[in-house]
Amino acid sequence: MTVTSDFTQKLYENFAENTKLRAVENAVTKNGLLSSLEVRGSHAANLPEFSIDLTKDPVTNQKQSGRCWMFAALNTFRHKFINEFKTEDFEFSQAYTFFWDKYEKSNWFMEQIIGDIEMDDRRLKFLLQTPQQDGGQWDMMVAIFEKYGIVPKAVYPESQASSSSRELNQYLNKLLRQDAEILRYTIEQGGDVEAVKEELLQEVFNFLAVTLGLPPQNFEFAFRNKDNEYKKFVGSPKEFYNEYVGIDLNNYVSVINAPTADKPYNKSYTVEFLGNVVGGKEVKHLNVEMDRFKKLAIAQMQAGETVWFGCDVGQESNRSAGLLTMDSYDFKSSLDIEFTQSKAGRLDYGESLMTHAMVLAGVDLDADGNSTKWKVENSWGKDAGQKGYFVASDEWMDEYTYQIVVRKDLLTEEELAAYEEKPQVLLPWDPMGALA
């Protein structure tokens, strides 16, 4: 069909005759789309009270960076630390894990680049499009914790580049694309690619040390708790993790809900090229139905433990009110537009994927033990939402949540066996390879 002037004129006339749309036009052009379509009743239907409420700790702030997955993981440890050691507040250093993730991702990128990939291969174009970025997956975070440990924020504080990472990413990716050309040329010429790679990694390390600061290898840290008890630590970041967190991360698994035809339930999946630490923990997911997905999250919170989760946070999101609900905005009554795509359809057609990781810090259950709304701890600071916390309706969770991390002992024998199987490898651009 060609769009003719007669056809467009008809659209003009149809709009002009629609008094409702003309009224909506006046409201939206003055106040903005979402402000004009906001549903007031959605606030009253999603009050922040929950039958299971695990934390009221002050929230953290990732600022202008894509470190949500790190903040979410470290926040789960943080709550444990605050409760166990009776501190008023505490944060682990998100900048410390950021440094080592950037370093390891650079090495990971170089390893993929020196693989057997032709220049016209779409996979090479995919790698070069974004050699590294801030985002990541749970298993990638585990790989960093296991290799480098963690430190208190007071020991390795924020830098300009960790809080606002755009410049760092721009120039690190510029350097890595140049490194890719150098490495592939070295291979073509029969040179010592490993020796060249070591020199290039020194440049990367120097760049990160200058922009983020040199991370500590050993440190001293002391604090007093609410009972005025004095505690002191001297040692390495890995020793600090073992002493003050001590969680065996191999006891946790990533569970996803991806209802697309190419991903049968109760099977495990990984994604080509997705990772950070060469030789570290493999990114791996178990796909389950949504009802089971939610039951696993509930079971972990009933046991007193918060849940790392990944979602598409921009969908139906009211940031100022702290609401994630399917009825936040009324497009149907105002614009005669209805969004009817299924969760699978949105994944298949590029409308949705995981964009953000947060923490499930509570849930409201009805008399039958079914979830009605969820308490979400975000990492956008105290001015977003309700002192940094959000309320997600159960329907929103169904439609826009894709990943949780839960203890292995919550899985059935059949689920655990499915997880332990050799995973199906998904294409690099699969939506389940999206980085939070």
Curated annotation (Swiss-Prot):
Pfam families assigned: Peptidase_C1_2
Keywords: Aminopeptidase, Hydrolase, Protease, Thiol protease
SUPFAM superfamilies according to UniProt: Cysteine proteinases
Documented EC number(s): 3.4.22.40
Catalytic class of the enzyme: hydrolase
Catalytic activity: Inactivates bleomycin B2 (a cytotoxic glycometallopeptide) by hydrolysis of a carboxyamide bond of beta-aminoalanine, but also shows general aminopeptidase activity. The specificity varies somewhat with source, but amino acid arylamides of Met, Leu and Ala are preferred
Record-annotated active site: 68, 356, 378
Domain of life of the native organism: Bacteria
Entry GO MF terms: cysteine-type aminopeptidase activity; cysteine-type endopeptidase activity
Gene Ontology CC: cytoplasm
InterPro entries, alphabetized: Papain-like_cys_pep_sf, Pept_cys_AS, Pept_his_AS, Peptidase_C1B
Biological process annotations from GO: homocysteine catabolic process; proteolysis; response to toxic substance
Its biological purpose: Hydrolyzes naphthylamide-substituted amino acids as well as di- and tripeptides in which the half-cystine residue is involved in a disulfide loop, notably in oxytocin and vasopressin. Also has a bleomycin hydrolase activity.
Family from the record: Belongs to the peptidase C1 family.
Complexes and interactors: Homohexamer.
Name by which UniProt lists this protein: Aminopeptidase C
Gene responsible for this protein: pepC
